Amino acid sequence: MATALVNARVLTADGFRDDVAVLVDAGVIDAVVAADDHRVSDFDIEDLGGDLLLPGFIDCQVNGGGGVLFNDAPTVATIRRIGEAHRRFGTTGFLPTLISDDIDVMREAIAAVGAAIAEGVPGVIGIHLEGPYLAPARRGVHDETKFRIPDADDIALASSLRNGRTLLTLAPERVPVDSIRELVRRGVIVCAGHTAAT
C-alpha cells in the first residue's frame, strides 16, 4: 500500500521541515516532497497530527537489552530479544556487542550474528567486538584476564563474519600495526578504544 505521511515535523538533511510529505510505497520511502506536491493525492493519506518523523537510529554498541546481555548468551534468540527491546526506542539497525571474552565465546557470538542476519532478524547489521585487545589501564568493566595480543587465528576470527559488518574496538598500542592493517584489508572497521595511547 502506498501512503503519504503528512502533517509531521520531518527531519531532513536540511533540518526539521513542516511543509513536506513522505511518500512510502511497500514499506520503503519513495520520496520526500512538498506537502502540496501533486503526487501526494495519488497516495493514501496518513495524518501524523504534527508528530515528529525521524529516520531510524543505528546503534553501533548494543551490549544487551530486554533483560539479556549478549556476552551471557551469544545466540540468535538473545539477538532477537535485544533487537525487540531497542526497536521500541527507534533503533532500526544495530551491532550486537561482545565485550572482551574467551575465543570460544567470540566464535559463538560471530556465528550467532551471521545466523541472525541470514534468518532476517530485524535490524542486525553486523557485530561489534569490543576487545579483547585493550589496555589494562583503561579496562573499564572488561575482565583483563581475557585480554591478549591478537595472533593470526584472532585476525581470521575477527574477520570471519561474511554477511554483515564487523567493528573491532582495540587499543592500538597493544596490537601490532601489521595486524591492524590486515584487519582493515579484510574489511574490519577498526576503532581505537580503551586505550592508554597518548
Give the label of every model feature segment:
Residues 82-83, 107-114, 155, 180:
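Generic structural signal for well-ordered alpha-helices
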Residues 148-198:
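Histidine/acidic residue-rich metal-binding segments in metalloenzymes
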Residues 63-65, 80-109, 123-135, 162-173, ...:
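Divalent metal-dependent hydrolysis catalytic cores, especially in the metallo-beta-lactamase
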Residues 1-40:
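N-terminal metal-binding scaffold of metallo-dependent hydrolase/deaminase domains
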